[in-house]
Amino acid sequence: MTTAETLRPALRRVLAQDAGTSADAHAIAAAALRAYERLAEVLTPLFGEAVINAVCARSVHLAQREFSWLAPAGSAEPHDAPITHVRVSLERQDPAVATDAAVAVLATFGELLALFIGDSLTTGLLRDAWPDAFSDDTTRETTT
């Protein structure tokens, strides 16, 4: 399996574990921000904050194709991660739509990362950020 095939279900688990299964859009937006922050915490020492923010901005831009209401990636202050403005956009949506959009942004981030460093390394880093989201079987299939 590739990162793309396993990432979206894993991200739904991340958001559900953090926000709860019957969460409102505010809780989902907060969970998405925390998920991004955990990922950035793992990736920033390896790639630097500027690279992480650039990949995030690109992820938001690509997700806007499906969710045109997402905050423009360029609307963030230079020192803010683009995801901070996405949170406001997510809070204004129906919970199901907010979940789909949050998953799209975070999954696109993971997919872009996989293009740069490969599926195996990406899966390992994603597992470091969200250890409960990936089952052992999924990780074994992805890394072998």
Name what the model sees in each region:
Residues 1-144:
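Long, compositionally biased intrinsically disordered regulatory segments in eukaryotic proteins
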